Amino acid sequence: MRNTFTRCLEDYARAHEELVLVTGDLGFGVLFPYMKEFPDRFFNAGISEQAMMSMAAGLALEGHTVVVYSIGNFPTLRCLEQIRNCCAYHDANVKIVCVGAGFVYGVLGMTHHATEDMSALRLLPGVKVYAPADAAETEAVMGPFLSEPGVAYLRIGRGGEACLHDAQALKGYESGKAVPYADGTDAY
């Protein structure tokens, strides 16, 4: 999922000069190709997530599409007030990406768990939440995630997730619509 995200991000950035990427001092292995190709559109905010989100809002209000990238709960719960006050209330074009949703970074302790992130962001006005199940769904949601105006949140796995969908079956994905895994009547 993470590699699919970065590939789609790079493709989008080539066609949209307004796109910038902000990270919280991590992800360099997977983000290196973006950093190399777009050095003027990459910012490392350091380990200061709240300032990172405020910076993203400022860039967005100046006309940029800003992607904020971090792990676990750091781009969400750590800076929920900044997302609410600086991004959501101003309908800033900020795209928040969490890598390692749920307990993926569990061995690092509960400070790295991202279990309440989706429900917290769903409470904020106008925030769209995307939670793809696999790389195929990640690719399908990247277009709407990046191109639709306003605040959006993308929650993806760290890598190695099983592929549940055929990418062709997801062509024409529409934001806000469910993607069925299978049809059947066994449940009723």
Language-model-detected regions and their locations in the chain:
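Thiamine diphosphate
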Residues: 1-178
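Short, intrinsically disordered, charge-balanced linker/junction segments flanking boundaries
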Residues: 181-188
